[in-house]
Amino acid sequence: MQSKILIIEDDHAITHLLDVALTLDYYNVTTADNATQAHFKIQIDKPDVILLDLGLPDKDGLCLISEIRQHTDIPIIVISARQEEQTIIQALDNGANDYMTKPFNVDELRARIRVIERIAKSHQETNIVFTNGLLSIDFGSKSVVINNQEVHLTPNEFSLLELLSNHKGKVLTYEMILKRIYGYVNKTEMPSLRVHMTSLRQKLSQCHEDAKDIIKTHPRIGYQMLQWKEK
């Protein structure tokens, strides 16, 4: 099956160049020239890889990365003329998987796409299922089920649940969680972590009231996944 690539770029010359080059490599290519179209194409076409320019006419690409990451973990390669170190760091922190600056080499881009595809394939093949009482987590498909009901989580919520389940019974400090989820330790992210945890607990408990008790808060220390106990 052909991999699907979505190009989000308002420069039609670059879009055409990428479309031709990637189609010759047997990719199924779709395009969007603004953020509004991009959201629609992501929802309808469900691409395997996104190529994103930051200078879109209706929204800054950095904001778009964050919005995309609220509902999907599709790999994103940024291709931008912006070369500032802080911009590159922010794009990666917001959820981009890779960053290339313009002008760029098409063959190098092809190679980076292949790397991302190999990583995605290896994750799919690691089809490990974790169970804890009525909770079931499929790490390969990133699906969560409680009491035969699917739980729809954001990428950050899933990462948080995955981390806790991989260390079931162990108290994970806030610092460790921040490092694993965000890639760095910054105490300013604590409110964001608490919001993700609150939302995660609410979604789990909507499927079964006992689910809220499997994650324990240790004040000023961190969180711990406990064994499921039905009341």
Swiss-Prot record:
DNA-binding region boundaries: 127-227
Modification comment: Phosphorylated by KdpD. Phosphorylation is required for transcriptional activity.
PROSITE patterns, alphabetized: OMPR_PHOB, RESPONSE_REGULATORY
Residues modified as 4-aspartylphosphate: D53
CDD domains the record matches: trans_reg_C (cd00383)
BP-aspect Gene Ontology terms: regulation of DNA-templated transcription
Highest taxon of the lineage: Bacteria
One CC-aspect GO term: protein-DNA complex
One Pfam family linked to the record: Response_reg
MF terms (GO), sorted A to Z: phosphorelay response regulator activity; transcription cis-regulatory region binding
Residue span, Response regulatory domain: 4-117
Keyword annotations of the record: DNA-binding, Phosphoprotein, Transcription, Transcription regulation, Two-component regulatory system
InterPro entries linked: CheY-like_superfamily (IPR011006), OmpR/PhoB-type_DNA-bd (IPR001867), Sig_transdc_resp-reg_receiver (IPR001789), WalR-like (IPR039420), WH-like_DNA-bd_sf (IPR036388)
Observed phenotype of the null mutant: Inactivation of kdpE results in decreased transcript level of cap.
Inducing or repressing factors: By the Agr/RNAIII system.
Functional note: Member of the two-component regulatory system KdpD/KdpE that regulates the transcription of a series of virulence factors through sensing external K(+) concentrations. Also regulates capsular polysaccharide synthesis. Upon phosphorylation by KpdD, functions as a transcriptional regulator by direct binding to promoter regions of target genes including spa, hla, aur and geh. Represses the transcription of kdpFABC operon.
Protein name, as recorded: Transcriptional regulatory protein KdpE
